[in-house]
Amino acid sequence: VDNEIKALADKERLPVSLVQLDVIDETSVKNAIQSIMTETGKIDVLVNNAGYGLSGALEELTIDEIKTQFETNFYGLIRTTQAVLPIMRKQKSGVVVNISSGAGRFGYPSGSAYVSTKFAVEGLSESISYELEQFGIKVVLIEPGFVKTGFDRATISSKKSQDPHSPYLQMMKKIDAASSKMVQNGCSPELVASAVLEAVTSNSPNLRYLVGKDVEGWVKSKKSMSDAEFHQMMAKGLS
């Protein structure tokens, strides 16, 4: 990935410096922020994009699998945010962009762990938007649907869900097939990047930016339908 970024930066003649950072490592986060401050003296934008998917029925997920999911998707985001907030507060400016998901708006089968992390990110982001407004710091949620990236390949299936004798095996097969099709029809990563750019360059950014026709449709249905109707619609898609 580093080589790809460097190649793209060279092609576009962009002055890009790469700094290694592991969101689950407190020391790594602190060292990265210190390195950036030494080089630039300020931090205007933080984009929390680290994350992965964990797929599996709740009954078959281990507590350790769920904890690891939260460690990256939620606690990692908190680590980086806490590290930059004193800097942005002193500057009296800054934008924190949290890459959430349509999964931060509604649940779906096999996604209990992943969805829970995104619901947590949504709640945290909305809460700190009030806290940070007084310091000129803006908070933004980017909520993509399916995107044509390698995220589907980075999604991990719980160990037990791969058991051929799993009572959830047929459900998981249907979900995997449906997800693969949706990724193929998903939006481009450039569309997500455009939403981020719009948010960080706006004087008054929205709290939430939905990205993708699929997620726009689902959220619209979620708002207009009763819980029972939305449940039936989602279940029908797996039948």
Region annotations inferred by a language model:
Residues 81-82, 126:
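A short, exposed helix-loop element centered on a Lys and neighboring polar residues
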Residues 81, 117-120:
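Active-site helix of classical SDR
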Residues 57-58, 65-67:
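Substrate-binding pocket helix/loop in short-chain dehydrogenase/reductase
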